[in-house]
Swiss-Prot record:
Quaternary structure, from the entry: Dimer of a heavy and a light chain linked by disulfide bonds. Interacts with Long isoform of CD74/Ii chain; the interaction stabilizes the conformation of mature CTSL.
Keyword DNA damage carried by entry: no
Assigned keywords, A-Z: Cell membrane, Cytoplasmic vesicle, Disulfide bond, Hydrolase, Lysosome, Membrane, Metal-binding, Protease, Secreted, Thiol protease, Zinc
Source taxonomy: Eukaryota, Metazoa, Chordata, Craniata, Vertebrata
Membrane topology label: Peripheral membrane protein
Subcellular location: Lysosome; Apical cell membrane; Cytoplasmic vesicle, Secretory vesicle, Chromaffin granule; Secreted, Extracellular space
Main location: other
The protein, known as: Procathepsin L
Length: 217
């Protein structure tokens, strides 16, 4: 497994998006993982509709702007037979009624894989599969006001996960400062152009390996 990987440099990752005042991080994490897998399969990077997931995946257990899980989103896409493009079904940051149109579907999946809850397993998946959906504890002001460097907060929990994000790579600075490259959905103004480097191999810091998964296409 390589010592560093960055899928943003290989065309797998769309520009940073902004979820706004809606608890839809799970939808952004899910589209991010599927955008990467569709690019891997087709060589085309197409931005996918979070709004489609917000509006339509309640039967799978999601709650729109009140939260959800990436695996439920992948399950919806499988059962629905597709997911519309961002362009055809733009983001509104609010709960609206399902307006899925199969003719605008830009992706589908056959299910999902849950990665074993270890950073080594996550590292292997990121290296071999592509961007991976993960959930983290992002409930600290240190995270909300993050700007640069490797994020580490001793109060971060590996169990109380409240935010879905996308691991797009990993790397290291110096001898032992290892990090995950994480795409957030709080717009490009947040953090480092919308990204955060999160401490890696520090006892599953912030729970990054606790609920990691990706869709199969």
């Amino acid at each position: 497994v390589p010592k560093s990987v960055d899928w943003t440099k290989k065309g797998y990752v769309t520009p940073v998006k902004n979820q706004g005042q809606c608890g839809s991080c799970w939808a952004f994490s899910a589209t991010g993982a599927l955008e990467g897998q569709m690019f891997r399969k087709t060589g085309k990077l197409v931005s996918l509709s979070e709004q489609n997931l917000v509006d339509s995946s309640r039967p799978q257990g999601n709650q729109g702007c009140n939260g959800g899980l990436m695996d439920n989103a992948f399950q919806y896409i499988k059962e629905n037979g597709g997911l519309d493009s961002e362009e055809s079904y733009p983001y509104e940051a609010t709960d609206t009624s399902c307006n899925y149109k199969p003719e605008y579907s830009a992706a589908k999946d056959t299910g999902f894989v849950d990665i074993p809850q270890r950073e080594k397993a996550l590292m292997k998946a990121v290296a071999t599969v592509g961007p991976i959906s993960v959930a983290i504890d992002a409930g600290h002001s240190s995270f909300q006001f993050y700007k640069s460097g490797i994020y580490y907060d001793p109060d971060c929990s590996s169990k109380d996960l409240d935010h879905g994000v996308l691991v797009v790579g990993y790397g290291f600075e110096g001898t032992n400062n290892k990090f995950w490259i994480v795409k957030n959905s709080w717009g490009p103004e947040w953090g480092n152009k919308g990204y955060v480097k999160m401490a890696k191999d520090q006892n599953n810091h912030c729970g990054i390996a606790t609920a990691a998964s990706y869709p199969t296409v």
